[in-house]
Amino acid sequence: MRVLLTSFAHRTHFQGLVPLAWALRTAGHDVRVAAQPALTDAVIGAGLTAVPVGSDHRLFDIVPEVAAQVHRYSFYLDFYHREQELHSWEFLLGMQEATSRWVYPVVNNDSFVAELVDFARDWRPDLVLWEPFTFAGAVAARACGAAHARLLWGSDLTGYFRGRFQAQRLRRPPEDRPDPLGTWLTEVAGRFGVEFGEDLAVGQWSVDQLPPSFRLDTGMETVVARTLPYNGASVVPDWLKKGSATRRICITGGFSGLGLAADADQFARTLAQLARFDGEIVVTGSGPDTSAVPDNIRLVDFVPMGVLLQNCAAIIHHGGAGTWATALHHGIPQISVAHEWDCMLRGQQTAELGAGIYLRPDEVDADSLASALTQVVEDPTYTENAVKLREEALSDPTPQEIVPRLEELTRRHAG
Protein backbone atom coordinates (compact mmCIF):
# COMPACT_ATOMS: atom_id res chain seq x y z
CA MET A 1 0.00 0.00 0.00
CA ARG A 2 0.97 3.65 -0.28
CA VAL A 3 1.73 5.32 3.03
CA LEU A 4 2.13 9.06 3.47
CA LEU A 5 3.75 10.39 6.63
CA THR A 6 3.50 14.08 7.33
CA SER A 7 4.93 16.52 9.85
CA PHE A 8 5.35 20.23 10.21
CA ALA A 9 9.00 21.31 10.13
CA HIS A 10 10.25 20.24 13.53
CA ARG A 11 13.23 17.90 13.35
CA THR A 12 12.86 16.11 16.69
CA HIS A 13 9.13 15.55 16.18
CA PHE A 14 9.85 14.05 12.76
CA GLN A 15 12.55 11.78 14.19
CA GLY A 16 9.88 10.08 16.29
CA LEU A 17 8.19 8.96 13.05
CA VAL A 18 11.23 7.41 11.39
CA PRO A 19 11.33 3.87 12.90
CA LEU A 20 7.76 3.11 11.82
CA ALA A 21 8.38 4.67 8.41
CA TRP A 22 11.23 2.25 7.86
CA ALA A 23 9.24 -0.68 9.21
CA LEU A 24 6.57 0.03 6.62
CA ARG A 25 9.18 0.43 3.90
CA THR A 26 10.93 -2.85 4.70
CA ALA A 27 7.53 -4.57 4.73
CA GLY A 28 7.27 -3.63 1.07
CA HIS A 29 5.06 -0.55 1.24
CA ASP A 30 5.66 2.65 -0.73
CA VAL A 31 6.46 5.35 1.83
CA ARG A 32 6.80 9.09 1.33
CA VAL A 33 7.19 11.94 3.80
CA ALA A 34 5.42 15.21 3.00
CA ALA A 35 6.64 18.10 5.11
CA GLN A 36 7.46 21.78 5.02
CA PRO A 37 10.69 22.54 3.09
CA ALA A 38 12.86 23.13 6.17
CA LEU A 39 12.49 19.44 7.05
CA THR A 40 13.67 18.11 3.68
CA ASP A 41 17.30 17.50 4.67
CA ALA A 42 16.24 15.62 7.80
CA VAL A 43 13.92 13.39 5.77
CA ILE A 44 16.61 12.65 3.20
CA GLY A 45 19.13 12.07 5.99
CA ALA A 46 16.83 9.38 7.36
CA GLY A 47 16.95 7.62 3.99
CA LEU A 48 13.30 8.38 3.22
CA THR A 49 11.64 9.98 0.20
CA ALA A 50 10.82 13.64 0.84
CA VAL A 51 7.95 15.61 -0.65
CA PRO A 52 8.36 19.31 0.24
CA VAL A 53 4.98 21.05 0.42
CA GLY A 54 3.87 24.55 1.36
CA SER A 55 5.90 27.15 3.19
CA ASP A 56 7.79 26.83 6.46
CA HIS A 57 6.01 27.70 9.69
CA ARG A 58 7.08 30.64 11.84
CA LEU A 59 5.98 29.34 15.21
CA PHE A 60 9.07 30.59 16.98
CA ASP A 61 8.61 34.11 15.63
CA ILE A 62 5.44 34.79 17.61
CA VAL A 63 5.55 37.93 19.71
CA PRO A 64 6.23 37.62 23.46
CA GLU A 65 2.67 38.58 24.41
CA VAL A 66 1.27 35.73 22.34
CA ALA A 67 3.92 33.31 23.58
CA ALA A 68 2.91 34.14 27.15
CA GLN A 69 -0.69 33.16 26.38
CA VAL A 70 0.45 29.80 24.99
CA HIS A 71 2.85 29.19 27.87
CA ARG A 72 -0.03 29.41 30.35
CA TYR A 73 -1.16 26.08 28.92
CA SER A 74 2.15 24.50 27.92
CA PHE A 75 4.48 25.25 30.86
CA TYR A 76 4.44 23.33 34.15
CA LEU A 77 1.60 20.94 33.32
CA ASP A 78 2.01 19.33 36.72
CA PHE A 79 -0.30 16.31 36.88
CA TYR A 80 0.92 15.59 40.41
CA HIS A 81 0.20 18.96 42.04
CA ARG A 82 -2.25 20.73 39.68
CA GLU A 83 -4.55 17.84 38.81
CA GLN A 84 -7.80 19.59 39.75
CA GLU A 85 -6.87 22.78 37.90
CA LEU A 86 -5.66 20.95 34.76
CA HIS A 87 -9.01 19.14 34.54
CA SER A 88 -11.20 22.19 35.14
CA TRP A 89 -13.44 23.50 32.37
CA GLU A 90 -11.73 26.89 32.48
CA PHE A 91 -8.28 25.40 31.93
CA LEU A 92 -9.38 22.92 29.27
CA LEU A 93 -11.22 25.61 27.30
CA GLY A 94 -8.30 28.00 27.67
CA MET A 95 -5.88 25.39 26.34
CA GLN A 96 -8.11 24.65 23.34
CA GLU A 97 -8.45 28.37 22.63
CA ALA A 98 -4.74 29.17 22.94
CA THR A 99 -3.47 26.29 20.83
CA SER A 100 -6.23 26.59 18.21
CA ARG A 101 -5.54 30.30 17.79
CA TRP A 102 -1.78 30.67 18.20
CA VAL A 103 -0.16 27.26 17.57
CA TYR A 104 -2.04 24.93 15.25
CA PRO A 105 -2.88 27.49 12.51
CA VAL A 106 0.75 28.65 12.51
CA VAL A 107 2.32 25.22 12.04
CA ASN A 108 -0.50 24.19 9.67
CA ASN A 109 -0.31 27.32 7.55
CA ASP A 110 -2.58 27.74 4.53
CA SER A 111 -0.02 26.87 1.86
CA PHE A 112 1.09 23.76 3.73
CA VAL A 113 -2.46 22.44 4.05
CA ALA A 114 -3.38 23.25 0.45
CA GLU A 115 -0.29 21.70 -1.13
CA LEU A 116 -0.52 18.64 1.12
CA VAL A 117 -4.13 18.10 0.04
CA ASP A 118 -3.14 18.55 -3.61
CA PHE A 119 -0.37 15.98 -3.30
CA ALA A 120 -2.58 13.49 -1.46
CA ARG A 121 -5.31 13.78 -4.07
CA ASP A 122 -2.76 13.19 -6.82
CA TRP A 123 -0.72 10.39 -5.20
CA ARG A 124 -3.72 8.69 -3.54
CA PRO A 125 -2.17 7.13 -0.42
CA ASP A 126 -3.99 4.32 1.32
CA LEU A 127 -2.85 5.47 4.77
CA VAL A 128 -1.76 8.84 6.16
CA LEU A 129 0.21 8.87 9.41
CA TRP A 130 0.46 12.35 10.89
CA GLU A 131 2.53 13.93 13.63
CA PRO A 132 0.04 14.96 16.35
CA PHE A 133 0.34 18.73 15.77
CA THR A 134 0.07 18.28 11.99
CA PHE A 135 -3.71 18.32 11.55
CA ALA A 136 -3.13 19.03 7.86
CA GLY A 137 -2.50 15.29 7.54
CA ALA A 138 -6.00 14.43 8.73
CA VAL A 139 -7.57 16.94 6.35
CA ALA A 140 -5.51 15.61 3.43
CA ALA A 141 -6.47 12.02 4.26
CA ARG A 142 -10.16 12.80 4.35
CA ALA A 143 -9.86 14.84 1.15
CA CYS A 144 -8.44 11.87 -0.76
CA GLY A 145 -10.31 9.05 0.98
CA ALA A 146 -7.35 7.56 2.84
CA ALA A 147 -7.35 6.04 6.30
CA HIS A 148 -5.42 8.13 8.80
CA ALA A 149 -3.89 7.92 12.26
CA ARG A 150 -1.78 9.99 14.60
CA LEU A 151 1.77 8.75 15.08
CA LEU A 152 2.70 9.85 18.59
CA TRP A 153 6.32 10.64 19.43
CA GLY A 154 5.71 11.43 23.11
CA SER A 155 2.99 11.59 25.75
CA ASP A 156 -0.45 12.03 24.18
CA LEU A 157 -1.33 15.34 25.80
CA THR A 158 -3.36 16.49 22.80
CA GLY A 159 -5.55 13.40 22.85
CA TYR A 160 -5.79 13.33 26.64
CA PHE A 161 -6.85 16.95 27.07
CA ARG A 162 -9.09 16.83 24.00
CA GLY A 163 -10.97 13.87 25.48
CA ARG A 164 -11.44 15.59 28.85
CA PHE A 165 -12.52 18.79 27.13
CA GLN A 166 -15.11 17.03 24.97
CA ALA A 167 -16.54 15.10 27.92
CA GLN A 168 -17.13 18.31 29.86
CA ARG A 169 -18.31 20.30 26.84
CA LEU A 170 -21.04 17.81 26.02
CA ARG A 171 -22.37 18.04 29.59
CA ARG A 172 -22.89 21.78 29.22
CA PRO A 173 -26.09 23.44 27.94
CA PRO A 174 -26.36 23.21 24.13
CA GLU A 175 -26.07 26.99 23.81
CA ASP A 176 -22.79 27.01 25.75
CA ARG A 177 -20.60 24.44 24.04
CA PRO A 178 -17.67 26.30 22.47
CA ASP A 179 -15.17 24.20 20.54
CA PRO A 180 -12.21 26.30 19.33
CA LEU A 181 -10.35 23.38 17.77
CA GLY A 182 -13.47 22.06 16.08
CA THR A 183 -14.30 25.53 14.76
CA TRP A 184 -10.82 25.99 13.28
CA LEU A 185 -10.74 22.51 11.74
CA THR A 186 -14.24 22.98 10.31
CA GLU A 187 -13.07 26.12 8.51
CA VAL A 188 -9.83 24.56 7.24
CA ALA A 189 -11.39 21.29 6.10
CA GLY A 190 -14.33 23.07 4.50
CA ARG A 191 -12.04 24.68 1.93
CA PHE A 192 -11.54 21.20 0.47
CA GLY A 193 -15.10 19.92 0.75
CA VAL A 194 -14.37 17.94 3.92
CA GLU A 195 -16.86 17.94 6.79
CA PHE A 196 -15.60 18.14 10.35
CA GLY A 197 -15.50 14.97 12.39
CA GLU A 198 -13.69 14.25 15.63
CA ASP A 199 -11.20 12.13 13.69
CA LEU A 200 -9.75 15.36 12.29
CA ALA A 201 -8.70 16.21 15.85
CA VAL A 202 -7.50 12.82 17.12
CA GLY A 203 -7.20 10.52 14.12
CA GLN A 204 -9.17 7.39 13.33
CA TRP A 205 -6.72 5.68 15.67
CA SER A 206 -3.30 6.43 17.16
CA VAL A 207 0.07 4.72 17.35
CA ASP A 208 1.51 5.13 20.86
CA GLN A 209 5.25 4.50 21.25
CA LEU A 210 5.50 4.94 25.02
CA PRO A 211 5.89 1.97 27.42
CA PRO A 212 2.87 1.00 29.56
CA SER A 213 3.98 2.91 32.67
CA PHE A 214 4.02 6.20 30.76
CA ARG A 215 0.91 6.02 28.57
CA LEU A 216 -1.96 8.39 29.20
CA ASP A 217 -5.46 6.92 29.28
CA THR A 218 -7.35 8.57 26.43
CA GLY A 219 -9.99 5.92 25.84
CA MET A 220 -9.20 6.07 22.11
CA GLU A 221 -8.30 3.22 19.79
CA THR A 222 -4.55 2.79 20.03
CA VAL A 223 -1.92 0.57 18.48
CA VAL A 224 1.07 0.14 20.79
CA ALA A 225 4.59 0.07 19.38
CA ARG A 226 7.99 -0.19 21.03
CA THR A 227 9.88 3.05 21.52
CA LEU A 228 12.88 2.76 19.21
CA PRO A 229 14.72 6.08 19.35
CA TYR A 230 16.23 7.59 16.22
CA ASN A 231 18.48 10.60 16.79
CA GLY A 232 19.22 11.57 13.20
CA ALA A 233 21.99 10.87 10.71
CA SER A 234 25.33 11.16 12.46
CA VAL A 235 29.01 10.25 12.52
CA VAL A 236 30.78 8.83 15.56
CA PRO A 237 33.55 11.26 16.57
CA ASP A 238 37.08 9.98 17.13
CA TRP A 239 36.94 10.51 20.90
CA LEU A 240 33.88 8.27 21.15
CA LYS A 241 35.25 5.44 19.01
CA LYS A 242 37.36 4.11 21.83
CA GLY A 243 37.70 4.43 25.58
CA SER A 244 34.65 2.32 26.37
CA ALA A 245 35.96 1.95 29.91
CA THR A 246 35.60 5.68 30.46
CA ARG A 247 32.88 6.48 33.01
CA ARG A 248 30.70 9.23 31.57
CA ILE A 249 27.77 11.51 32.33
CA CYS A 250 25.84 13.28 29.57
CA ILE A 251 24.30 16.74 29.92
CA THR A 252 22.18 17.84 27.00
CA GLY A 253 19.25 19.91 25.83
CA GLY A 254 18.47 23.54 26.53
CA PHE A 255 21.22 23.90 29.12
CA SER A 256 21.81 27.54 28.24
CA GLY A 257 18.17 28.34 28.98
CA LEU A 258 18.48 27.47 32.65
CA GLY A 259 19.24 30.02 35.34
CA LEU A 260 22.33 28.03 36.31
CA ALA A 261 23.78 28.82 32.86
CA ALA A 262 22.53 32.38 32.51
CA ASP A 263 26.00 33.76 31.79
CA ALA A 264 29.58 32.57 31.42
CA ASP A 265 30.39 32.93 35.13
CA GLN A 266 27.29 31.04 36.22
CA PHE A 267 27.92 28.37 33.60
CA ALA A 268 31.51 27.95 34.83
CA ARG A 269 30.33 27.61 38.45
CA THR A 270 27.83 24.95 37.44
CA LEU A 271 30.43 22.98 35.54
CA ALA A 272 32.84 23.26 38.48
CA GLN A 273 30.23 21.71 40.78
CA LEU A 274 29.46 18.89 38.36
CA ALA A 275 33.16 18.24 37.74
CA ARG A 276 33.38 16.58 41.15
CA PHE A 277 32.00 13.50 39.40
CA ASP A 278 34.70 10.83 39.04
CA GLY A 279 34.70 10.46 35.26
CA GLU A 280 34.07 12.45 32.10
CA ILE A 281 31.10 14.79 31.71
CA VAL A 282 30.00 15.38 28.12
CA VAL A 283 28.01 18.59 27.67
CA THR A 284 26.22 18.83 24.31
CA GLY A 285 24.55 21.80 22.70
CA SER A 286 25.20 25.48 23.07
CA GLY A 287 26.01 27.22 26.33
CA PRO A 288 27.59 30.51 27.31
CA ASP A 289 31.20 30.88 26.26
CA THR A 290 33.64 30.09 29.00
CA SER A 291 37.40 30.47 28.72
CA ALA A 292 38.25 27.39 30.73
CA VAL A 293 36.48 24.28 31.91
CA PRO A 294 37.61 21.53 34.30
CA ASP A 295 39.72 18.80 32.75
CA ASN A 296 36.98 16.19 32.95
CA ILE A 297 34.39 18.32 31.12
CA ARG A 298 34.02 17.86 27.36
CA LEU A 299 31.98 20.51 25.50
CA VAL A 300 30.63 19.40 22.10
CA ASP A 301 28.09 20.86 19.69
CA PHE A 302 26.60 17.49 18.77
CA VAL A 303 27.15 13.82 19.50
CA PRO A 304 25.23 10.69 18.39
CA MET A 305 23.11 10.29 21.49
CA GLY A 306 22.46 6.59 21.01
CA VAL A 307 26.20 5.92 20.84
CA LEU A 308 27.14 8.15 23.77
CA LEU A 309 24.52 6.79 26.16
CA GLN A 310 25.71 3.21 25.71
CA ASN A 311 28.59 4.17 27.97
CA CYS A 312 26.97 6.66 30.37
CA ALA A 313 26.17 6.23 34.05
CA ALA A 314 23.40 8.87 33.91
CA ILE A 315 22.04 11.76 31.87
CA ILE A 316 20.87 15.28 32.72
CA HIS A 317 18.45 16.67 30.13
CA HIS A 318 15.49 18.95 29.43
CA GLY A 319 12.92 16.18 29.09
CA GLY A 320 12.57 16.03 25.31
CA ALA A 321 10.90 12.86 24.07
CA GLY A 322 13.79 11.71 21.88
CA THR A 323 16.46 12.16 24.53
CA TRP A 324 14.25 10.62 27.21
CA ALA A 325 13.46 7.61 25.00
CA THR A 326 17.13 7.08 24.14
CA ALA A 327 18.07 7.07 27.83
CA LEU A 328 15.18 4.70 28.57
CA HIS A 329 16.30 2.41 25.75
CA HIS A 330 19.78 2.16 27.29
CA GLY A 331 18.53 1.69 30.85
CA ILE A 332 20.34 4.59 32.51
CA PRO A 333 19.09 6.93 35.28
CA GLN A 334 17.75 10.31 34.17
CA ILE A 335 17.75 13.73 35.79
CA SER A 336 15.06 15.78 34.06
CA VAL A 337 15.12 19.57 34.33
CA ALA A 338 11.89 20.09 32.43
CA HIS A 339 8.82 22.30 32.22
CA GLU A 340 7.44 22.37 28.65
CA TRP A 341 4.47 20.42 27.30
CA ASP A 342 4.87 16.70 28.13
CA CYS A 343 8.52 16.96 29.20
CA MET A 344 7.63 17.67 32.82
CA LEU A 345 5.21 14.75 33.03
CA ARG A 346 7.69 12.17 31.74
CA GLY A 347 10.34 13.50 34.10
CA GLN A 348 7.99 13.18 37.06
CA GLN A 349 6.86 9.71 35.98
CA THR A 350 10.46 8.53 35.62
CA ALA A 351 11.25 9.86 39.10
CA GLU A 352 8.14 8.25 40.60
CA LEU A 353 9.23 4.91 39.12
CA GLY A 354 12.60 5.27 40.83
CA ALA A 355 14.65 5.60 37.65
CA GLY A 356 15.68 9.22 38.06
CA ILE A 357 15.12 12.61 39.66
CA TYR A 358 12.92 15.47 38.48
CA LEU A 359 14.00 19.09 39.08
CA ARG A 360 12.01 22.22 38.27
CA PRO A 361 13.99 24.64 36.07
CA ASP A 362 12.85 27.61 38.16
CA GLU A 363 14.21 26.02 41.34
CA VAL A 364 17.36 24.19 40.26
CA ASP A 365 20.84 25.55 40.93
CA ALA A 366 24.38 24.22 40.64
CA ASP A 367 24.28 22.64 44.10
CA SER A 368 20.97 20.83 43.65
CA LEU A 369 22.01 19.58 40.22
CA ALA A 370 25.32 18.24 41.53
CA SER A 371 23.54 16.65 44.50
CA ALA A 372 21.04 14.92 42.21
CA LEU A 373 23.85 13.62 40.03
CA THR A 374 25.68 12.17 43.03
CA GLN A 375 22.47 10.53 44.21
CA VAL A 376 21.58 8.73 40.98
CA VAL A 377 25.16 7.62 40.34
CA GLU A 378 25.95 6.33 43.83
CA ASP A 379 22.60 4.69 44.63
CA PRO A 380 22.37 1.51 42.48
CA THR A 381 18.58 1.33 42.78
CA TYR A 382 18.25 4.10 40.20
CA THR A 383 20.09 2.03 37.62
CA GLU A 384 18.20 -1.11 38.62
CA ASN A 385 14.87 0.66 38.10
CA ALA A 386 16.05 2.18 34.82
CA VAL A 387 16.90 -1.31 33.57
CA LYS A 388 13.42 -2.50 34.58
CA LEU A 389 11.88 0.30 32.49
CA ARG A 390 14.07 -0.70 29.56
CA GLU A 391 12.80 -4.28 29.90
CA GLU A 392 9.21 -3.02 30.04
CA ALA A 393 9.76 -1.04 26.84
CA LEU A 394 11.27 -4.07 25.11
CA SER A 395 8.11 -6.05 25.89
CA ASP A 396 6.13 -3.92 23.42
CA PRO A 397 5.93 -5.05 19.77
CA THR A 398 8.52 -3.62 17.41
CA PRO A 399 7.45 -1.20 14.67
CA GLN A 400 7.81 -4.05 12.18
CA GLU A 401 5.52 -6.28 14.23
CA ILE A 402 2.62 -3.79 14.17
CA VAL A 403 2.61 -3.40 10.37
CA PRO A 404 -0.02 -6.15 9.85
CA ARG A 405 -2.29 -4.39 12.35
CA LEU A 406 -1.89 -1.11 10.47
CA GLU A 407 -2.75 -2.88 7.22
CA GLU A 408 -5.92 -4.27 8.82
CA LEU A 409 -6.98 -0.87 10.21
CA THR A 410 -6.30 0.77 6.86
CA ARG A 411 -8.66 -1.64 5.12
CA ARG A 412 -11.31 -0.99 7.77
CA HIS A 413 -11.16 2.81 7.63
CA ALA A 414 -10.33 3.60 3.99
CA GLY A 415 -12.85 5.33 1.75
Swiss-Prot record:
SS bond list: none
Sorted UniProt keywords: Antibiotic biosynthesis, Glycosyltransferase, Transferase
EC number(s) reported in the record: 2.4.1.328
Catalytic activity, as annotated: dTDP-beta-L-mycarose + erythronolide B = 3-O-alpha-L-mycarosylerythronolide B + dTDP + H(+)
GO molecular function, one term: hexosyltransferase activity
Organism superkingdom: Bacteria
InterPro entries per record: EryCIII-like_C, EryCIII-like_N, Glycosyl_450act, Glycosyltransferase_28, UDP_glucos_trans
Keyword flag Transferase: yes
Gene Ontology biological-process entries: antibiotic biosynthetic process
Record family assignment: Belongs to the glycosyltransferase 28 family.
Purpose: Involved in the biosynthesis of the macrolide antibiotic erythromycin. Catalyzes the reversible transfer of mycarosyl from dTDP-beta-L-mycarose to erythronolide B to yield 3-alpha-L-mycarosylerythronolide B. It can also use TDP-beta-L-cladinose.
Miscellaneous comment as given in the Swiss-Prot or TrEMBL entry: It does not require an auxiliary activator protein.
Name assigned to this protein: Erythronolide mycarosyltransferase
Annotated organism of origin: Saccharopolyspora erythraea (Streptomyces erythraeus)
